[in-house]
Amino acid sequence: IYRGILDTTAVIWMGEFGRTPTINGNGGRDHWARSWSAVVGGAGFTRGVVVGETSADGREVASEPYSSQDLMTSVLKSLDISLETTFRAKNGRPMKIANGGQVIPGLFS
């Protein structure tokens, strides 16, 4: 019954920020917005690819910097949702779902 479900279902694992590459004074890690990771699959995403990289110490993006808007635009493309789709905020203001992002080419073959 579930065979082929990933053809039309996108699976996304991510957080809203990364974590510092070093341990802080309390033995933990702090928020780190300069670099973060996401894992995507299904719905037309290419399998087994890595897009972009950080510096050796994990502090900065070393290649292929993308934004959260780019990731959202790529998810919308994978699900065949128009980038012109709008929704209404609580105050009634129309908002574009893609918000100006670009498709990340390395995620699709």
Residue locations for each model-derived region?
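Ligand-binding pockets and gating/stacking loops
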Residues: 1-109
